Amino acid sequence: MSEPQQQPVVKRADDITYESVDAADGMRKGVLLDESDGAPNFAIRRFVLEPGASVPKHTNAVEHEQYVLEGEYIVGIDGEEYTVSAGDSLLIPADVVHWYRNEGDEQGAFICGVPNGDDEILLAE
């Protein structure tokens, strides 16, 4: 007997709910696709950093692949700070301290892909 075939999913922008991120001032997250949509391996999320947003130093148990959609903001990774803008890509390995800060007047936004499953987030400060 063959395995059931995975079904395609098209999720519209209007179907995405954004929620504030705990411990992050001025950041919102919308889950674009994950296990609940039938994606077996990865979740993709869209994060918005409002002007003045600040996300404290923290680690995640899973890697993050990110693509900057809009704006310009600062990402700290393992002790170094980078100013990123639309079109930039980032790899943040698992268990590496990182943080975000939007010092500009415009919102920033990025796509973040992570493996499905549990992710333990630990504040570093």
Residue spans for each PLM region:
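A short, N-terminal "cap"/entry segment at the start of jelly-roll beta-barrel domains
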Residues: 1-41, 124-125
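Short acidic-glycine-tyrosine-enriched beta hairpin
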Residues: 79-95
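Conserved short histidine dyad/triad with adjacent acidic residue
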Residues: 29-30, 45-60, 94
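Short, conserved beta-strand element in jelly-roll/cupin
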Residues: 46-50, 60-77, 113
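Anionic, Ser/Thr-rich low-complexity intrinsically disordered regions
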Residues: 33, 44, 110-111
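Ligand-binding loop in jelly-roll beta-barrel domains
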Residues: 94-120
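Short histidine-centered beta-strand/loop micro-motifs
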Residues: 33, 55-60, 101-103, 123
